[in-house]
Amino acid sequence: MARKYSHIIVIGVDGAGSWFKDADTPCFDEIFKDGAVTYKALSSKPTISAECWGSMLIGVGPEIHKLTNKRVSVLPYSVWSKNPTVFRRIRKAYPEAELGSYCDWNPINKGIVERNASVNKQTARDKELTPLICDYIKDKKPDFLFVHFDSTDGAGHSNGYGTPEHIKAINEVDKLIGDIYSSIESAGILEETLFTVIADHGGTNNENGKGSHGGWTDEEKYVTFAAEGKDIVSGEIKEMNIRDLAAIVLYGMGIDAPAFNEKGWTAQIPKGLFSDYDGEYLDISHLTGAAPRISNEHHKSELI
């Protein structure tokens, strides 16, 4: 399979749910005005960060990868796992590829991205992280870059999801997304880049105005995904699960994905996303996910 893009950049926005549609996001709106967008991509069960980011980067459900926030905070992801991340798959296919993972929440770098994939890893708070990302893009022109922003989830936990404070945090992240997109233009690689934004989960609020997540309400399970690049079909994506990100990345890199298997790889290419792809899209709504639980925790950003 031929490689479609020289560069793929994924911006992950923790806890943003589907609220991009309610926020003031001029950068997001301009970037994806001719792209593919959905505010109803389905999260993973339970709707908690490690379970969700793990599913997106590995292409399997939480019941398969078994990652939790506690686990990724203390244990590195096995370099021998039969379910490798997209980083390891790309490294195998392209030994000289430049790979980056710039995350506010360091457990992604510590407990999901493999140690043997030769990934440039950085950790800082969102606003401090963004200039590092922009410099990295201009200097290294990465083949694949994953970015994780976390201020949105912190605002949701502290002030409630969908509240003015939470929406304001999304507004602020929109500016950072705009800065990153501008750096791609400055690097002269925009025409060969697949640029995506994705959230992992939303959240619900208690009587004290605090937010949590982990359940399967509409507010928790529906999230934003957007993609822009050549061969992306403009319009609404009708059906998608967040784990499909792994399949999208591999397809864009020209790497054959594993065969669909309900006990393993369940990432798929959403119908109508790419103009040159017309494969079937299988229903996985009956898959149970991992054991349910609720998260009230605020992530901490620790330097590597």
Where do the language-model regions lie?
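Feature captures the catalytic ectodomains and active-site-proximal regions of enzymes
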Residues: M1-I304
